[in-house]
Amino acid sequence: MSHKILLVNGPNLNLLGRREPSVYGHQTLADIVATLNQQAQQAGVELEHIQSNAEFELINAIHATDAQMIIINPAAFTHTSVALRDAMLGVAIPFFEVHLSNVHAREAFRHHSYFSDKAIGVICGFGAQGYEFALSAAIKQLKG
């Protein structure tokens, strides 16, 4: 059985490298995904990626995936999207939640997540490296 992981990135992450680099770092999303693709390939795992600023596109991708694991950075949808949470619960695919910044050290409204209580794990505050940690953990979960 081949292993597949879906990487889901929410709104404004397409601006990585330009948007508040002091908070989110200087790497672009393309840079991050390239690193993750290399990591996945070395582990013999397929990585599928979607980034969208539109909630319905993320939901449709989650509904359509045949992945066995999801890594999600819901971005601003973390604090607002019951629909995206319901999509994750509806497909019942285990997932890791990732945030580039330490959301708990930021504004109070960023402290609540609609996903954390259902995630296998939550990784925040490590910048782009957080995705690598999540991918390593997901691969370990899949391969036992």
Swiss-Prot record:
Pathway membership, UniProt: Metabolic intermediate biosynthesis; chorismate biosynthesis; chorismate from D-erythrose 4-phosphate and phosphoenolpyruvate: step 3/7
GO molecular-function terms, A-Z: 3-dehydroquinate dehydratase activity
Catalytic activity: 3-dehydroquinate = 3-dehydroshikimate + H2O
Enzyme Commission code: 4.2.1.10
Active site: 24 (proton acceptor), 99 (proton donor)
Annotated keywords: Amino-acid biosynthesis, Aromatic amino acid biosynthesis, Lyase
Site (Transition state stabilizer): 19
One annotated GO biological process: amino acid biosynthetic process
Residue positions binding substrate: 73, 79, 86, 100-101, 110
Enzymatic class: lyase
InterPro entries: DHquinase_II, DHquinase_II_CS, DHquinase_II_sf
UniProt keyword Amino-acid biosynthesis present: yes
A Pfam family recorded for this sequence: DHquinase_II
SUPFAM superfamilies tied to this protein: Type II 3-dehydroquinate dehydratase
Function summary: Catalyzes a trans-dehydration via an enolate intermediate.
Similarity section: Belongs to the type-II 3-dehydroquinase family.
Subunit structure: Homododecamer.
NCBIfam families to which the protein is assigned, alphabetical: aroQ, PRK05395.1-1, PRK05395.1-2, PRK05395.1-3, PRK05395.1-4
Protein name: 3-dehydroquinate dehydratase
Species, as recorded: Shewanella sp. (strain W3-18-1)
